[in-house]
Amino acid sequence: MGIFDWKHWIVILIVVVLVFGTKKLKGLGTDVGESIKGFRKAMHDDDKPAEQPAPQPQQAQPAPQGSPLNQPHTIDAQAHKVDEPIRKDQV
């Protein structure tokens, strides 16, 4: 039996109907139903793209001989010290 008997559930249902009203509960039920329907549709749509064949890869064009592809870039620069003003709250 547990803590909540069927009589308790009926009393709770009556209180909920009195507090929220049947119109609001109907709208809530409709919204929940549409949400579940949309979720199922989204789950079904996620499966469809996996079934489609992958597009054929394009043939790679050879790189020009004059420009190497993976050469590291080195930047020659020198750091300069910046004098920042002293904040009043740190003194």
From Swiss-Prot:
This is Sec-independent protein translocase protein TatA. It is a single-pass membrane protein. The keyword Cell division does not apply. Part of the twin-arginine translocation (Tat) system that transports large folded proteins containing a characteristic twin-arginine motif in their signal peptide across membranes. TatA could form the protein-conducting channel of the Tat system. It comes from Pseudomonas syringae pv. tomato (strain ATCC BAA-871 / DC3000). Keywords: Cell inner membrane, Cell membrane, Membrane, Protein transport, Translocation, Transmembrane, Transmembrane helix, Transport. It is found in: Cell inner membrane. Residues 42-91 are annotated as: Disordered. The chain crosses the membrane at residues 1-21. Residues 78-91 have a biased composition (Basic and acidic residues). GO terms for molecular function: protein transmembrane transporter activity. The Tat system comprises two distinct complexes: a TatABC complex, containing multiple copies of TatA, TatB and TatC subunits, and a separate TatA complex, containing only TatA subunits. Substrates initially bind to the TatABC complex, which probably triggers association of the separate TatA complex to form the active translocon. InterPro entries: TatA/B/E, TatA/E. GO terms for cellular component: TAT protein transport complex. Residues 51-64 have a biased composition (Low complexity). GO terms for biological process: protein transport by the Tat complex. Belongs to the TatA/E family. NCBIfam families: PRK00442.1 (NF001681), tatAE (TIGR01411).
